[in-house]
Amino acid sequence: MKMNKKIIKIILAIIIIAIIGSLLYFNNMFKLLNDENNSGIQENIQTENNINNSIENNVTNIVNDQVTSDNNTTDGIEKNNLVSYNGMLKIENNTLVNSKGEKIQLKGISTHGIQWYGKYANEKVIKNLRDEWGANLFRIAMYTSEGGYLQDRTIKNKVYEIADIAIKLDMYVIIDWHILDDNDPLQHINEAQEFFEETSLKYGNTPNIIYEICNEPNGDITWKNNIKPYAEKVISTIRENSKENIIIVGTGTWCQDVDKAAEDPINDKNVMYSLHFYAGTHTEWLRERASKALKTIPIFVSEWGVSDATGNGGIYLDEANKWMKFMKQNNISWANWSLSDKNEASALLLPNTPENDISDKYLSESGKFVKEAIKD
């Protein structure tokens, strides 16, 4: 049906141009019959030829434009879910909206650590996630430790390479400062400011970019004494160059303590607060906590999985479905963990999946579930 409509448009355009061309042709023939000057006749013949050539060129251009349009068409996602329609995102009434003030739910995929599984974060795969899965969001997990930024500054180049692909594909992209073992964000605040100063300077007010400034604060730290002071300084650094972009701030206990952030939010109109869940561990009690927090702050689920919190303990699809319903009802955006072939339950791909092929035959049970969840 889609192709038939496009063919009809092409035919109609050709007919219209042909009618116009015919009128011009007969007008010139009339002039020819009334013109006894041979040179004038030659000039009019040349004019006629030019008109015919112009008609042919216009028809060719229309057909070529239609072919280009076909190549840019996305089957799995509506165009109005992409950046070209929604523009710079913002927060209104504790929920995410687009530049027109319309509610928007971002749904997509997070990489695993790009120092290990970065090969899957390539243009062919990300385009497939957009076109076949319907994803409008891609999250880049740049670990700070474990061979990440603190050990190898050049990993930022991989981050920028992936971000540029997502921008090219008209998607939103989260640049994630992925703390984990280095549990206290204050521990490496200087390095964080260094990275986000450079990154925000590079991307400025590019509407695709979302900053996530501390993945999962954990251990013996608090919102008041560790996370909020860190966030305020890093946010100030980003705002020097990126005035309006959404910034996601992690919360305590591996991003479960959204209630603490709700009691003492950051003074920035476009900050969101991260909630992470794994379906086998985090159940109704965490949804209840999130519901209360939503009365005060906007929440972004920047990481979740169908397994338990280890990433490799079972598949809990019933509980995962409850979370999908909860996030849809509350317009909570999300990114699933993870785009990798790691031998664990939360990985979207089976072990030894080729780096350019995420077709259904290579999807894990988690991958199949998440693909359908994005489409819903």
Residue spans for each PLM region:
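Aromatic-lined substrate-binding rim segments of carbohydrate-active enzymes
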Residues: 122-182, 189-194, 239-241, 319-330
